[in-house]
């Protein structure tokens, strides 16, 4: 089996990407998409090219668009360091590390629902969980 990872970004033509994967002999992709709707669209394209799709789900370090929404609606969901500084406001090694706090029941409920929503998409054949750890 020959697989790769791919993030569905606005500047990527997914039809072309899956065509190249098929031509290269890939069997599957761990795909990160911004929304269930994007997964649905991408799964349809992948199927035409014989590519199996596993959802590559970013858990405690949500992607930029999702992170921004959480920061606006639930700033208290982010991890706090020993100095009382939230990763929502203070850099933890790199600017993209804005980790949610897994100790909060609300965060766990949010992540469970996110995975359930993705698992309900016809054609998503597996899940690859990423960023399932505490911030460095």
Please annotate each region the language model reported.
Residues 1-4, 29-31, 53-57, 127-130:
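Hydrophobic faces of well-ordered beta-strands that scaffold small-molecule active sites
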Residues 5-9, 34, 58-62, 131-134:
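Active-site beta-loop-alpha junctions enriched in small/polar residues
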Residues 8-38, 121-124:
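Catalytic domains of carbohydrate-active enzymes, especially glycoside hydrolases
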Residues 14, 39, 107-111:
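Aromatic/hydrophobic pocket-lining residues that form the small-molecule binding cavity
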Residues 21, 53, 111, 118, ...:
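Conserved, mostly hydrophobic/aromatic
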Residues 22, 40-50:
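Surface-exposed amphipathic alpha-helices with a cationic face
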Residues 37-43, 63-67, 136:
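Extracytoplasmic/secreted cell-surface and envelope-processing proteins
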Residues 55-121:
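Active-site-adjacent "subsite" loops/lids of carbohydrate-active enzymes
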């Amino acid at each position: 089996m020959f697989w790769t990872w791919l993030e569905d970004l606005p500047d990527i033509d997914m039809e072309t990407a899956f065509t190249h994967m098929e031509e290269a002999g890939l069997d599957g992709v761990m795909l990160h998409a911004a929304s269930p709707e994007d997964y649905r669209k991408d799964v349809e394209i992948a199927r035409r090219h014989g590519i199996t799709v596993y959802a590559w789900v970013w858990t405690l370090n949500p992607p930029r668009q999702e992170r921004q929404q959480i920061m606006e609606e639930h700033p208290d969901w982010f991890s706090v360091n020993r100095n009382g500084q939230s990763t929502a406001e203070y850099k933890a090694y790199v600017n993209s590390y804005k980790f949610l706090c897994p100790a909060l029941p609300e965060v766990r409920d949010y992540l469970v629902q996110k995975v359930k929503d993705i698992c309900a998409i016809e054609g998503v054949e597996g899940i690859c969980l990423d960023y399932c750890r505490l911030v460095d």
